[in-house]
């Protein structure tokens, strides 16, 4: 029983609200076209069709019945002509609305174009019974197209707002909360409306021919900032400005054509902007997905490097130790045999060389410092191991990065960039000083390696010297690596602290 009364109250409220809005829009339309029956085909048609495209089918009889009652009442009061044509046309419009009603809850650019096509088809069907009335058939088509494309998209905007907003019941907890008026958006809308109104009313007579082109300015501005909703709201502002300047038009057809043109512009531009935004969102998701995959690949690569380094260290290290031990035994057993003793010493030296080579290889595969030290300590250890001071290179480290904010991939990447950059400086730069700086800035990790040497040879920025691998690692984490050689070489790395 409660459900029945709730439904009944909703239906009655919809009936009276729609009837009041329909009559107000009919009065405005009558001011523009000055014929009662044609006025019903302008904005009232757009209101009824716009609501039918958005609301469930159960409310269609309420809207259609309210319109028929109003049309019948107007026929008695103001001698409204062609009453059967209006009613037959309104029934015919149910066909395209019914075909597109299943897609009304979608929120993509295709919905805008689909509803635009439904509006066009409904306008054709509404004006179809007027074919026997001569020139009035074209007037009916122009009126229905203009009214439908002007008001129906606005119904879509309001319906989207009402259905996408979370509504909470009014309670004591909400009374004390301030109202968010979103003043910046309101001021932005108001300024554009004033500009649009001034362009229609305030331009000199010699510039009046440019006023139709000015209608696109608010549409473009709001579409750029707010997407398809902004484009459709801009068409409503333009429609109000055009109606306010109706006295400047020599013929109502000029006004209707202007309304129709700017409504089509708003609808198509809104669909285009929505399509562009959807593509951008899709590209951003794919880019984020690719970066996540690349980061996982880096983590997998480091895991494999760590396992290989451990196996090399355990197996080859033990083997080399055994070789050195056996070589020492041979030397002691053959102390009187100079040739054998010399061969034992050579074997021991070669095994030491192999051990050093394997040790360097292990350092390249997986820096052992990262397993035992923090990143700052690992970089200091790297500076000591490279013996820069013995090579006449003064080093300075300024590290201000919080390591708790770093992922394992970022730690390894920053260390390897430092490792490769220092190797290039030692081998090619002929530098006397090198500076490493690391800091956090605006949710980004910054690393700069700078020396006062001769710079990299020409053409080495794109290939060689480990730069390709460095760039690939940094790019895989969503960062950038730049190299400049103005005074020495400067390697700059910028990584997002957390890639989303």
From Swiss-Prot:
Q: Name one GO biological process term.
A: signal transduction
Q: Which residues carry this modification: Phosphohistidine?
A: 313
User: What are the residue boundaries of the Histidine kinase domain, all occurrences included?
Assistant: 311-499
Example GO molecular function term? phosphoprotein phosphatase activity
What is the annotated localization of this protein? Cell inner membrane
Posttranslational mods: Autophosphorylated.
A Pfam family annotated for this UniProt entry: HATPase_c
Which PROSITE patterns does this one have?
HIS_KIN (PS50109)
Which PANTHER family does this one have? NITRATE/NITRITE SENSOR PROTEIN NARX-RELATED, SIGNAL TRANSDUCTION HISTIDINE-PROTEIN KINASE_PHOSPHATASE UHPB
Question: What is the protein name given in its UniProt record?
Answer: Signal transduction histidine-protein kinase/phosphatase UhpB
Species of provenance: Salmonella typhimurium (strain LT2 / SGSC1412 / ATCC 700720)
């Amino acid at each position: 029983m409660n459900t029945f009364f709730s439904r009944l109250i909703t239906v009655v409220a919809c009936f009276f609200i729609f009837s009041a809005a329909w009559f107000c829009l009919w009065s405005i339309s009558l001011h523009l076209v000055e014929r009662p029956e044609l006025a019903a085909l302008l904005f009232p048609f757009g209101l009824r069709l716009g609501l039918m495209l958005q609301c469930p089918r159960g409310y269609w009889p309420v809207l259609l019945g309210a319109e028929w009652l109003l049309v019948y009442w107007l026929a008695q009061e103001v001698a409204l002509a062609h009453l059967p044509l209006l009613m037959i046309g309104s029934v015919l419009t149910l066909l395209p609305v019914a075909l597109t009603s299943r897609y009304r809850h979608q929120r993509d650019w295709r919905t805008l174009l689909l509803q635009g096509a439904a509006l066009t088809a409904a306008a054709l069907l509404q004006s179809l019974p007027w074919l026997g009335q001569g020139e009035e058939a074209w007037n009916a088509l122009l009126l229905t197209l203009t009214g439908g494309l002007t008001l129906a998209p606005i119904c879509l905007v309001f319906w989207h707002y009402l259905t996408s907003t979370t509504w909470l019941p009014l309670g004591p907890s909400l009374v004390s909360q301030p109202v968010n008026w979103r003043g910046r958006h309101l001021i932005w809308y108001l300024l554009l409306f004033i500009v649009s109104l001034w362009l229609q009313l305030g331009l000199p007579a010699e510039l009046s021919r440019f006023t139709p082109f000015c209608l696109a300015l608010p549409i473009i501005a709001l579409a750029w900032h707010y997407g398809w909703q902004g484009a459709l709201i801009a068409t409503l502002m333009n429609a109000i400005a055009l109606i306010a300047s109706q006295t400047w038009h020599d013929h109502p057809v000029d006004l209707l054509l202007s309304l129709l043109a700017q409504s089509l512009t708003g609808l198509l531009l809104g669909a285009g902007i929505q399509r562009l935004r959807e593509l951008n969102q899709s590209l951003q998701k794919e880019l984020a997905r690719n970066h996540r995959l690349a980061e996982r690949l880096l983590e997998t690569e480091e895991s494999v490097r760590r396992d290989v380094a451990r196996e090399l260290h355990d197996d080859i290290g033990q083997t080399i130790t055994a070789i050195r031990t056996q070589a020492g035994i041979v030397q002691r057993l053959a102390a009187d045999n100079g040739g054998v003793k010399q061969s034992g010493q050579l074997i021991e030296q070669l095994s030491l060389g192999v051990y050093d080579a394997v040790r360097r290889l292990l350092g390249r595969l997986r820096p052992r410092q990262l397993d035992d030290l923090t990143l700052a300590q690992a970089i200091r250890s790297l500076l000591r191991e490279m013996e820069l001071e013995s090579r006449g290179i003064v080093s300075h480290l300024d590290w201000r990065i919080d390591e708790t904010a770093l992922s394992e991939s970022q730690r390894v990447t920053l260390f390897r960039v430092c490792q490769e950059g220092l190797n290039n400086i030692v081998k090619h730069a002929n530098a006397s000083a090198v500076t490493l700086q690391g800091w956090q800035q605006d949710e980004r990790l910054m690393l700069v390696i700078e020396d006062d040497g001769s710079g990299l040879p020409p053409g080495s920025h794109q290939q060689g010297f480990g730069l390709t691998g460095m760039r690939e690692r940094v790019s895989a984490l969503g960062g950038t690596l730049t190299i400049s050689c103005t005074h020495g070489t400067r390697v700059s790395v910028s990584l997002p602290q957390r890639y989303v």
